Amino acid sequence: MFARHLGLTDFRSWARVDLDLEPGRTVFVGPNGFGKTNLVEALWYSATLGSHRVATDAPLIRAGAERAIVSTIVVNEGRELAVDLEITSGRANKARLNRSPVRSAREILGVLRAVLFSPEDLSLVRGDPGDRRRYLDELATTRRPALAGVRADYDKVVRQRTALLKTAAGARYRGDRSVIDTLEVWDGHLAAHGAALVASRVKLVEELQPEVEKAYQLLAPASRPAAIRYRSSVEAIEDAPGPESVEFYEAALLDALARRRDAELERGVCLVGPHRDDLELRLGDQPAKGFASHGESWSMALALRLGAYELLCSDGVEPVLLLDDVFAELDTSRRRALATVAGSAEQVLVTAAVGEDIPEDWDARRVEIRMVEDDGGRVSMVAS
C-alpha cells in the first residue's frame, strides 16, 4: 500500500497544495513551523479521522477559512481508491469515496493504513491512560474499521449516562424511581458497547505483546525486557487469565455497575467501564511510567509503534510509515534500528528540520518546504 497523491485546501498552514507521492522514501525538509508536519498530520487524519496533535478539528482549519479539505489517492495491490474529507468546525465531517458521497466519514476508515511515529509518542509512556487507550483503539480500528462505530456508541452512552447521574442522586432522595429505572437502561447500553470494546482491546494486547517485546529488544538490547498488559477497572475482567467472550465482559460490567451504583450517584460520574482502563507498560519488574529513563521511554514508545507496524503487516497489508521529526529525537543506536525497519517499508514519508537528521545511507526523494506571506497571512508551499 502507498499514498499516490495528497491534496490539501485550507488545512493548517496550507492554503492549497497538490503533492504527487511515490513508493519508497520521501523526506519533507524545512525549518520548524513551516508546515511539514501538517502534511503528515493530514495523512494520519485521512487514516484515522483524528489528529495526533490536537483533540478537536477546529485547529486544522486555516485561519479565516470555513472548512478544510484533505484528499488522498491510495494504491493497494494495483487498485486506486480516492478519499476526500471535508472538515468543518462544529459539524460532522463529510466524506467521499471515489468521488461518491458516503453516509458517514467512518466508512473511509481502512482505505489508508498508516503507522505514525512522532515526538508526541513519549506520552504513550509518560502520559495519562487516555493516551494509551487511544493508541489501542486507533490500532484496533485500523485493523477492524467497524470498531469505530462501537467506540462512537460507547462514548455517546458514557456522556448521556454521566448527565443522568448528575441528576439521579437528587431524584432518588425525593423517591423518584423513574430516574433509577432509566439509569438501569443506560447500564445495559454501557455494558453491551463496553464489552465489545474491552474484547477488542484484550485480544489486541495479546497479539501485540510479543511484537512489542521483540521490537524493544531490537531497540535496546542491553535494557530490561519489555512487556505490556491490559489493566481493567473491573475486578472480574482484571483477574481473567486471557481473552474471554463478549458475553463474559458484558456480565462483568453489569455486575460492577450494580456494585458501584451508590458511589456513582454520590460522585455523579461513570466509575465503571473501558473508559477507565489502561495499558500497562513494564520494563523488567517495574512500570515504565515513573521508572524508565529518557532513553528507555523512547525505546518503549518506538516499540509500541513498531509492534503496531508488524501486526498490520501480518494482516496482509503493509501500512504507510509516517515519521514526524523522530530521527532528531533519537540517539545513534535507536536511529539505526528504526532506519533498518523503515528502510524495508513500501512507503516511508519523513519530516526533518535539516537533511542531516536523516540516515546518511538513505536514498530518499527530498521535498523542500517554504513559508511565504500572502493576503491571508503566512502560508506553506513546496519549493519549486
Curated annotation (Swiss-Prot):
Main location as per UniProt: cytoplasm
Subcellular location(s) of the protein: Cytoplasm
Keywords associated with the record: ATP-binding, Cytoplasm, DNA damage, DNA repair, DNA replication, DNA-binding, Nucleotide-binding, SOS response
Gene Ontology biological process terms, A to Z: DNA replication; DNA synthesis involved in DNA repair; double-strand break repair; SOS response
PROSITE patterns registered for this protein in UniProt: RECF_1, RECF_2
Pfam families: SMC_N (PF02463)
A GO-annotated cellular component: cytoplasm
Top-rank lineage group of the source organism: Bacteria
Residues engaged in binding ATP: 30-37
GO MF annotation list: ATP binding; single-stranded DNA binding
Alphabetized HAMAP family for the sequence: RecF
UniProt-listed NCBIfam families: recf
Family membership: Belongs to the RecF family.
UniProt function note: The RecF protein is involved in DNA metabolism; it is required for DNA replication and normal SOS inducibility. RecF binds preferentially to single-stranded, linear DNA. It also seems to bind ATP.
Protein name, entry field: DNA replication and repair protein RecF
Upper lineage: Bacteria, Bacillati, Actinomycetota, Actinomycetes, Mycobacteriales
